[in-house]
Regions:
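Generic beta-sheet signal
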Residues: 11, 118, 174-176, 228, ...
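Surface-exposed, active-site-proximal loop segments in enzymatic domains
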Residues: 79-94, 125, 190-193
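Alpha-helical scaffold segments that form or flank carboxylate-/histidine-based iron centers
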Residues: 117-122, 126, 226
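Mid-to-C-terminal alpha-helical segments outside catalytic/metal-binding sites
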Residues: 1-9, 16-73, 100-108, 129-133, ...
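Charged helix-capping and loop-helix junction motifs
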Residues: 91-99, 155-162
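Catalytic pocket-lining loop regions of alpha/beta-barrel enzymes
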Residues: 106, 133-291, 295
Length: 338
């Protein structure tokens, strides 16, 4: 434990095997995928060798970076877009291999790493089986899904076997951004906004909101969803979302009129948010005030936003010592059963 009186547990920390990163770079260079957002993003990221080295290292170099910034434990998750840009068979094989690799790192460094399991939503039943293997046999602490899968979102009931598995296993699903899908991405790419600057939040906020309105959380009331970047703007919009969801129902295409709870109730009862990339006291304290102190977890967003000074900035958020311990340590321990 660091000298501040709590462990700093970072909950959205990316990794990937180098061979997967090489595949992304090749796909972007050859434009072998019909996804302008992916091509734009991995053309840029693929030109950053130090970033790739940090992503691929789940050993001594990463731990040295953690030590230099005061991070006690990282929860590792397969970087975006994970396996979700491949065909179902390839995706399932890559997910299983990645889970085996990251589980080995956790076994080697149990005091420094925990990890989430990658699954392939392309095959929901297979994803549910892999979730059970990864949690029960490998000891992984939840699932990572990098938002849309070839333009499809988890509000579609065909994916709900994944929700059923996560609820039965009592593990959360972390919905992490990727770039907007082809049917959405055009203006974002044209304006250079497809990545973390704006497109990530817009796409992932849409995805999570669609899940809230789908009825999935009535069918799976104990399902827990984790969302980064202080909630992808959804906490800021909760009042208006509730108002419009109520007053505009006759004009809204979906089953929203059959929901058992308001959208804000689903957010406060089923969703947790992390501070990844948002080391700014006004935002952190706002989200805590909206969702509650028990529902906000610290994250760094390593290695994409490896800024050790931001750890100190988050230490200095004007909340009580007890609430800082929740933010950095005990909320993560509870949500991920650490």
């Amino acid at each position: 434990m660091t000298a501040v009186g709590y462990k700093r547990i970072a909950t959205e920390e990316a990794w990937a095997p180098m061979e997967l990163l090489d595949t992304y770079r090749s796909m972007a260079a050859k434009k072998s995928i019909d996804d302008p957002g992916f091509i734009a993003l991995w053309t840029r990221l693929g030109a950053r060798p130090v970033l790739s080295e940090r992503l691929a290292d789940i050993g001594d170099r990463r731990i040295a970076d953690m030590d230099s910034s005061g991070i006690d434990l990282q929860i590792l998750s397969l970087t975006s877009p994970g396996v979700q840009v491949f065909d179902a068979q390839t995706a399932a094989s890559l997910a299983s291999s990645a889970n085996d690799q990251v589980a080995e790192a956790v076994r080697k460094y149990p005091a420094r790493f925990a990890a989430l399991a990658a699954v392939a939503p392309q095959d929901p039943r297979g994803a549910a089986r892999e979730a059970e293997r990864a949690v029960r046999r490998l000891g992984l602490k939840g699932l990572i899904i990098n938002s849309h899968t070839r333009g499809e979102h988890l509000d579609d009931p065909k994916f709900w076997e994944i929700f059923e598995a996560a609820e039965a296993l009592k593990v959360p699903i972390y919905i992490h951004p990727q770039g907007p899908p082809p049917q959405m991405v055009g203006p974002y790419v044209d304006k250079g906004l497809e990545g973390a600057l704006w497109g990530f939040a817009a796409e992932t906020g849409l995805h999570v909101l669609a899940i809230l309105r789908s009825g999935a959380l009535d069918r799976f009331p104990d399902l827990r969803i984790v969302v980064g970047h202080c909630g992808e703007a959804l906490p800021f919009w909760l009042f208006r979302l509730d108002y419009m969801n109520k007053t505009a129902r006759p004009f809204i295409r979906s089953g929203a009129d059959r929901l058992k709870r308001t959208l804000s109730e689903y957010m406060r009862e089923n969703v947790y948010v992390t501070t990844s990339g948002m080391a700014w006291a006004p935002v952190i304290t706002f989200v805590q005030s909206v969702l509650g102190m028990d529902r906000v977890l610290y994250a760094m967003d390593y290695p994409y936003q490896f800024e050790p000074d931001e750890v100190t900035a988050t230490d200095n958020v004007p909340i009580s010592d007890a609430d800082k311990k929740k933010l950095f340590q005990t909320n993560a321990e509870r949500v991920f059963a650490l």
